[in-house]
Amino acid sequence: MTKNRIGIDVGGTNVKFALISPKGKILYSNSTPTRSEMGYEYTVNNIKQAISTLMSETNSSSKNIDGIGFGFPGQIDYKNGVVINLPNISGWNNVHIAEIIKKFISFVEAFLKYVSNVLKVSLK
């Protein structure tokens, strides 16, 4: 059974989410404000809540999700899953986002790529 992926695009204004089928069809999408002035923890909590909402509204579980692809507009350490710096979003300095998300949803792998590649990585 081929599983779906979640794509997350973290931008300066909004964080956009999508559930994507193995054939590239967007099954669900939504967004939430980034609110960078509130600090990265606020945005991370919004990301967690949005993932929970996405999974609930699409009846998704570990049985049909096998990865989350992230896109960030800044310097990323892909190997270690760390956001080194997002120049346009304050507070995102050396944030171990892959580790944070893996602890939140332990059954998926978290991938990090530039914004332009987030959906491609999500379909990997």
What are these language model-derived features?
Residues 6, 22, 61, 111-117:
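Generic short amphipathic/hydrophobic targeting helices enriched at N-termini
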